[in-house]
Amino acid sequence: MSVRRTRKDDGSQWTVADSRSVYGIRHWGAGYFAINEAGRVEVRPNGPDSSPIDLYEQVDNLRKSGLSLPLLVRFPDILQDRVRQLTGAFDSNIARLEYQSQYTALYPIKVNQQEAVVENIIATQNVSIGLEAGSKPELMAVLALAPKGGTIVCNGYKDREFIRLALMGQKLGHNVFIVIEKESEVELVIEEAAELKVAPQVGLRVRLSSLASSKWADTGGEKSKFGLSAAQLLSVVERFRKAGLDQGIRLLHFHMGSQIANLADYQHGFKEAIRYYGELRKLGLPVDYIDVGGGLGVDYDGTHSRNASSINYDMDDYAGVVVGMLKEFCDAQSLPHPHIFSESGRSLTAHHAMLVVQVTDVEKHNDEVPKIADKESLPETVQWLVDLLGPTDIEMVTETYWRATHYMSDIATQYADGKISLAEKALGEQCYFAVCRRLYNSLKARQRSHRQVLDELNDKLADKYICNFSVFQSLPDTWAIGQVLPILPLHRLDEEPVRRAVLQDLTCDSDGKIKQYVDEQSIETSMPVHSLNEGEDYLLGIFLVGAYQEILGDMHNLFGDTDSVNIYQNPDGSVYHAGIETHDTIEDMLRYVHLSPEELMTHYRDKVASAKITPRERTYFLDALRLGLTRSSYLSS
């Protein structure tokens, strides 16, 4: 283990408490993740009062058992704890406000359809939990996995077969709601209900005018892909009334968007939504359920703010708004209190999964002070940079930086114009980065005049840590929508991270890197890291990847699924592993794009046979090619 380093600002010894602050784990960890006194990340799957699990130790054991990196690690116990927290928040507010109905949490399986995820959520004891499906494949899964009598809500665009399957689910004993998203679905429901001789339970999705501020705001508001306008709503009601099925309209549904950061935005939209409830009741419809959709967010960056990757509220605040506003409206209008559904899939699943990656290589600027024998022989601009390598008064730190940057710009121009040589340009660059490194060590984050330069140098001096994973396969939201995910080393957190780095993946794509990082209470373009120790793997954990990432991942450069494992905790604190799945092989990935490994081997044999190589080489080449098809698409770890 490396020698502990001292903090640059005040000279005191670095402690684990400093790492907790720098990586913000207390803020985004939600009581599940922490740093122990040994400087390692630990997880408490059943909440902050449960027994800790040393993540670095677990990953080491899993690697020794044959699993390889990158590794997706799931903690199904966290799923059940999240369900208990969410239902507990609603139940406590229902009791506190004397609300005269109940709450059921709906899990929309589009968030993560993995069997272990769905089964662990619905297996949570002593809670009311249902499932939501938005496509025929999802509905087929839900019909099998939902407990008998369980609630199933059917959203999304529907054809005749979708509606028939939903009605079959109702006849099989499930509490099924078919939510009308567009007018053309009405006749299909009427016809299929008559064919199956079942009275359908119908929900109506309204398209709100209100729009929340979030990365997914387009899923709500007037431009939403789904939902009925006011005129369409009245038309749908009338068509069901003419068919004699209007008394089956029992649910009102709306959706304002995912990851709503500001609770005030939600309150504004909810005020509009509950007006629809009142109007539908006035039309004589027996609406007694309201599905408030998604929106309950996750504090990814730990700032507890209205940033796009944060939220300025918690589960209890959210439940209090929903229950409180509904009760106030219903009491004022003398209306019954409806049963509440919410589709809080992101909040239920985000925390339960993390990705472990290994740093395989480092690229850094040469910021060592060069040895210069004859300064006078150098171009004038390079000489000026050499002069800046000497001591600088603290008052002149920022001015020295701006001068050095100006000189470096001149050097780049002179090289392009053919006025200086490649060697002279390289020396100028080394001098420039040596000046920047020296100035960086003199800057004080607490001094306002230093902050702009400090931010620029954090970018310029950041190393490139090449990591054994694919952003596109494992963290698609980080490149697609700029999602921020917390990242930190799993070990060495009792040492100061003296470098900064940008994490880059293995793909041949300029977007194959992580561009934003949680750094204390802010978002930065690089992250604090440790220098690598020779002979020791440096492992990073990327957290809160349990929602959407696994299912949205793609195969860019033919990087496939990673190894994965579910870690469970026994009541005595011990752990066991289940659901182990190994990585996609190169052969698997080639088959995905309809390249036959058998045909490829035939081509290999033909080329080896016609090549001017020795018999021994032929055997070696064919064995290597055959073995290569069975290997992981990632680098060997």
From Swiss-Prot:
SUPFAM superfamilies: Alanine racemase C-terminal domain-like (SSF50621), PLP-binding barrel (SSF51419). This is Biosynthetic arginine decarboxylase. Keywords: Decarboxylase, Lyase, Magnesium, Metal-binding, Polyamine biosynthesis, Pyridoxal phosphate, Spermidine biosynthesis. One of its GO terms (molecular function) is metal ion binding. Catalyzes the biosynthesis of agmatine from arginine. Transmembrane segments: none annotated. GO terms for biological process: arginine catabolic process; putrescine biosynthetic process from arginine; spermidine biosynthetic process. It is an enzyme of class 4 (lyase). Its EC number is 4.1.1.19. The modification N6-(pyridoxal phosphate)lysine is found at residue 110. Substrate binds at residues 290-300. Its cofactor is Mg(2+); pyridoxal 5'-phosphate. HAMAP family: SpeA. It catalyses: L-arginine + H(+) = agmatine + CO2. Belongs to the Orn/Lys/Arg decarboxylase class-II family. SpeA subfamily.
